[in-house]
Amino acid sequence: MGKTIGIDLGTTNSCVAVLDGGKARVIENGEGDRTTPSVVAFTDDGEILVGSPAKRQAVTNPNKTLFAIKRLIGRRFQDEEVQRDIGIMPYKIVKADNGDAWVEIDGDKKAPPQISAEVLKKMKKTAEEFLGEKVTDAVITVPAYFNDAQRQATKDAGKIAGLNVKRIINEPTAAALAYGMDKKSGDNVIAVYDLGGGTFDISIIEIDEVEGEHTFEVLATNGDTHLGGEDFDNRLINYLVEQFQKDQGMDLRKDPLAMQRLKEAAEKAKIELSSAQQTEVNLPYITADNAGPKHMAIKVTRAKLESLVEDLIKKSLEPLKQALADADLSVSDIQDIIMVGGQTRMPKVQAAVTDFFGKEPRRDVNPDEAVAVGAAVQAGVLQGDVKDVLLLDVCPLSLGIETMGGVMTKLIEKNTTIPTKESQTFSTAEDNQSAVTIHVIQGERKRAGDNKSLGQFNLEGIRAAARGVPQIEVTFDIDADGILHVSAKDKDTGKEQKITIKASSGLDESEVDKMVKDAEAHAEEDKKFEEMVQARNQADGLVHATRNQLKEVGDALSQEDKDAIEKACEELEQASKDGDKEAIDAKSQALMEASQKLMEAAQQQQAQQGAEGAAGGEQQSSKADDDVVDAEFEEVKDDDKK
């Protein structure tokens, strides 16, 4: 049975870990890094780049370099957060036929799960190279506050990447697992403050320890799926754009190339200001006008950055208060605070959390790796390799149906431990009603229309009767991934209708299957591309070695033979440029055949040099022997030594 890997699919960076000898190990990618940028780029020649190679070329290819795609996953195009991102992102965000937010590359529309699948494929390959075996099973993490549509879209991304997603778990819960594995005794109530690249979560988790077995029970969770490091970056970018406009009278927002350079510089400056009090954003030749090139050189202090993002930090404290209230706990009940996500390295964020809880957060959990480590632990639990851990997660938002008067009637309250199943009996609103529409919604508002619509279906064939007489049992069943299954049953006729909520947006099964096939086709293309590169490299090496031999022993050949070899070299070079692997192989073979006499001449020369070397060595040896004088030894008795 193959290993199950744990993947933290992040907004900014992703990470993969596996249980190795009972301990979770973070795996380095092909570039030697423990985290991989969640960046996917499409080049002009059709190549797909993922991770650092994609990030490095972003400045020269801003419209086709996709980052922070997690902010779009499972979202509708008209969502306020998506509309806000459209004005910031250099790539094109478009409305799909089903109303989802997709991206467009060279006129080709792509769903966010397709893009996330490229990052997951990279994680899968990283794990396979380390383990030396094929990997198909994975546990993938999502923000605790992800709704049903976002969780389903993440599962779709895993399927497109060729992974069997055994479990979707919440990021703060995963971080708690990573932390709890080292804490071997006693009960504990912890708060996990997770501020990542694009999402924010707070979870209150109780860890109970009984005879070495740990139960992780999530008491409450809250958050904002559109608050993270990207928003902090954007505040700094806007400030720099405004300062430049004041100084130079030019708006950089109209120049995608300049904005991409500015994004990189802002991210770097933000990171530097976590350890320094001041930094300078220095971008020569950022743009140009009729008067010539323009340069940016703007000093930014830590205090300035803090003032730009102060409201974002405050915004993260509201869910903390709500989560504590939902868990029926006070600040003094929290024994430990874990901070997860790269943005928690900012001193002002750490200070705000310290002030809120009245104690310092723990520093021994790596904020970039903890979530992947926890996912690997959960993978070990599912595989049976970890016996003493039980994870009890919760659904982040209330679930219910729309009832008469446009009211939301809740069947499952938020922060209910999952998996769970709840049933409630409803009736008809009118006399002789033969069908009912079950409209499934998620959220905390009383008015159904103010909540997130997850989908709807009809139960037909209800027997004619006065209003209020038919009995329709609606059942909500949430699985361990937090994905909802709904059924409605007419108790009188026994007729039943079931759906797995895919949200009114989302990808249907046929779309996912098509994307899986596309991904498999790409895998074949990638393999061919690798083989082509290998063939080209071998061809270049062969041409280089042949020409070197021509220089060294070419005099031993006739001019006709030399011309034939040079012609074969040129033909192989041309085949290499044309990029036809079969032609490269054929021309390589032709060059080897044409060079037969050249190789023989080279071997003869080597043999001659070897023979001359050996003869010279013997001569030296005999001369050396003539100069040797036999030594005369005299035995010295012990008595003579004294």
From Swiss-Prot:
Induction comment: By stress conditions e.g. heat shock.
Pfam families, per the entry: HSP70 (PF00012)
Check the record and name the InterPro entries matching this protein.
ATPase_NBD (IPR043129), Chaperone_DnaK (IPR012725), Heat_shock_70_CS (IPR018181), HSP70_C_sf (IPR029048), HSP70_peptide-bd_sf (IPR029047), Hsp_70_fam (IPR013126)
Bias (Low complexity): 600-620
Which PROSITE patterns did the record assign? HSP70_1 (PS00297), HSP70_2 (PS00329), HSP70_3 (PS01036)
Alphabetically ordered keywords of this record: ATP-binding, Chaperone, Nucleotide-binding, Phosphoprotein, Stress response
- Kindly list the GO molecular function terms attached to this UniProt entry: ATP binding; ATP-dependent protein folding chaperone; unfolded protein binding
This protein's source sits in the domain of life called Bacteria
In which residue ranges is the amino acid composition biased (Acidic residues)?
Answer: 627-642
Compositional bias (Basic and acidic residues) spans?
570-585
Q: Where is this region: Disordered?
A: 570-642
Q: What does this protein do?
A: Acts as a chaperone.
* NCBIfam families found in the cross-reference section: PRK00290.1, PRK05183.1, prok_dnaK
Q: Which family does it belong to?
A: Belongs to the heat shock protein 70 family.
The protein depicted here goes by the name: Chaperone protein DnaK
The species this protein was found in: Idiomarina loihiensis (strain ATCC BAA-735 / DSM 15497 / L2-TR)
The primary gene name is: dnaK
